[in-house]
A protein has these predicted regions:
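Pyridoxal 5′-phosphate
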Residues: 1-400
Length: 400
C-alpha cells in the first residue's frame, strides 16, 4: 500500500505535540471554572487571561478585544448576527465567493429586513478597486459627509444604507489574499461595521487587527496546528454587539458558557510557536507548494492554476484539469493515497460549483475540474515529488 500524503491543511491541521501537551496539562491542572471565586477558579482565570493577552499581542489587538468562541464559524456568526441585531436593518456588502460561514449567516438575515449586495472580484479573485464604486453608485470620493454608504435596493430604486460589510482576508479555496484596507478605511470613515474572516490567514501570514482597521475579525485554532473547538473574535473596543446566545456573563456577556481554559491555552501556544518561526515557516511552505505546482505543470502543462500566483497563501494550490470531473479526480487521488479536497470542507456534499471560482469568471470546464492542494510543515520535498507523480498518473488515466 502506498504511504498516505496529506495535502488538505486548509481543512484542518494536526496539533503540534507542544500544543497537545499544553492542553493536556491544563485539563489536569487548570480544570476549575474560571468564573469561580475560590483559589482554583482564580488560577484557571489567570491561565485564561494570560492566553488572551498572548493572542491579543500576536494579532495586534487589546486583550479586552479578544472574545473566545468555539471556532471561526461561530466567530463570524457572532460578528454578523451581533452587528445586525444592534442596528437598524439595511444592506450587507460582501465579496463574491465568501466562506459558507459568512454567506449563510448573511442569507439568514434577509427575512429580518436585510438585503445583500456583492462586491465584485477580478479574474484572480481579488477585490476590484472600482467594485466599491459600482456598489456605492456615488463613488467613494464623492460621499462627502454622508452618514452611511448607500446602494440601490434589490426591490426598487430607493437607496438602502450599507451598514455591514464583510470580506475574507485569505480565501480558503484559492488562497488568494485580499487587500482589505481600502474597504476597511471607507467603512470606518462612514460608520459601517466591517468584519474580516481571517480564519485561513491567521497562523499563515501576519495579521495585525489594529492596522487592518476592521471592526471585527474571526480566527480558528485548528487551522494553525492548534486544538479543534476553539477560536476567537477580535472586536474593536467600544463596539456594540448583541449576543445571540444567552445564559451567562462570560466574555463580557457576548459569548455565554464556561470558558474552555485548556483549549485557549493550546491556541495561544500554537500562535506563539508560529510567531517564533513565522519567516522560516512561510519560506518552507512556499518551497513545498512551488515544488508540487512545478511538478504538476510539468506533467500537465495544460492545467490551469486558479487565483493569483502572486497574492496567495504560501501553502495553497488550486489547480484545474479542464475536461475532467473534480469529484472523479478526488476519489481516485484518495485511492492513490493523496488527501486533498475540492474546496471548502464546510460546503462538502454541495452540488453547487465553487462560488469563489464562479465569481472569478471561471468557465464550467475549469471550476468543475478544480482541486485544492494545501501543503503543511509536516510535508517533505520528497512527498511533493511523489505526489506530483501520483497525481499525474491519475490525471493521465482519467483522460484515457
Amino acid at each position: 500500500m502506498l504511504p498516505r500524503i496529506y495535502l488538505d491543511h486548509n481543512a484542518t491541521t494536526r496539533p503540534w505535540p507542544e500544543v497537545i501537551e499544553t492542553v493536556a496539562y491544563h485539563l489536569q491542572h487548570s480544570y476549575a471554572n474560571p468564573g469561580s471565586r475560590h483559589a482554583e477558579g482564580r488560577q484557571a482565570r489567570k491561565v485564561l487571561e494570560s492566553s488572551r493577552e498572548s493572542i491579543a499581542s500576536i494579532l495586534g489587538a487589546q486583550p479586552d478585544e479578544v472574545i473566545f468562541t468555539s471556532g471561526g464559524t461561530e466567530a463570524s456568526n457572532l460578528a454578523l448576527f451581533g452587528a445586525a441585531h444592534s442596528m437598524t436593518h439595511g444592506t450587507i456588502a460582501l465579496t463574491a465567493g465568501e466562506h459558507p460561514a459568512t454567506i449563510e449567516a448573511c442569507k439568514s438575515l434577509k427575512p429580518h429586513g436585510w438585503e445583500l449586495a456583492l462586491l465584485p472580484v477580478d479574474h484572480e479573485g481579488r477585490l476590484l478597486a472600482e467594485g466599491v464604486g459600482s456598489l456605492f453608485p456615488s463613488g467613494p470620493s464623492s460621499l462627502g459627509n454622508a452618514d452611511r454608504l448607500t446602494v440601490r435596493s434589490e426591490k426598487d430604486s430607493r437607496p438602502r444604507s450599507v451598514r455591514i460589510a464583510t470580506v475574507i482576508l485569505a480565501h480558503n479555496e484559492t488562497g488568494v489574499i485580499q487587500e482589505v484596507r481600502p474597504l476597511t478605511t471607507i467603512c470606518r470613515e462612514h460608520g459601517v461595521f466591517c468584519h474580516i474572516d481571517a480564519v485561513q490567514a491567521v497562523g499563515k501570514i501576519e495579521v495585525h487587527f489594529a492596522e487592518l482597521g476592521a471592526t471585527s475579525l474571526a480566527f480558528g485554532a485548528h487551522k494553525f496546528h492548534g486544538p479543534r473547538g476553539i477560536g476567537g473574535l477580535l472586536l474593536k473596543k467600544g463596539t456594540t454587539l448583541a449576543p445571540f446566545e444567552f445564559g451567562g456573563h462570560q466574555e463580557s456577556g457576548r459569548r455565554p458558557g464556561t470558558e474552555m481554559v485548556a483549549l485557549a491555552a493550546g491556541m495561544a501556544k500554537a500562535l506563539e510557536m508560529w510567531l517564533r518561526e513565522r519567516h522560516e515557516r512561510t519560506a518552507r511552505l512556499s518551497e513545498l507548494r512551488n515544488r508540487l505546482e512545478a511538478g504538476l505543470l510539468d506533467r500537465c502543462p495544460w492545467a490551469v492554476v486558479n487565483g493569483s500566483r502572486e497574492h496567495r497563501l504560501p501553502n495553497t494550490l488550486n489547480i484545474a484539469f479542464p475536461g475532467l470531473d473534480g469529484e472523479a479526480i478526488l476519489v481516485n487521488l484518495d485511492l492513490e493515497g493523496i488527501a486533498c479536497s475540492l474546496g471548502s470542507t464546510c460546503a462538502s456534499g454541495s452540488a453547487e460549483p465553487a462560488p469563489a471560482l464562479v465569481a472569478m469568471g471561471a468557465p464550467p470546464e475549469v471550476y468543475k475540474a478544480s482541486v485544492r492542494f494545501t501543503v503543511g510543515l509536516e510535508n517533505t520535498l520528497a512527498e511533493m515529488d511523489d505526489a506530483a507523480e501520483r497525481i499525474g498518473r491519475v490525471i493521465a488515466r482519467l483522460r484515457g
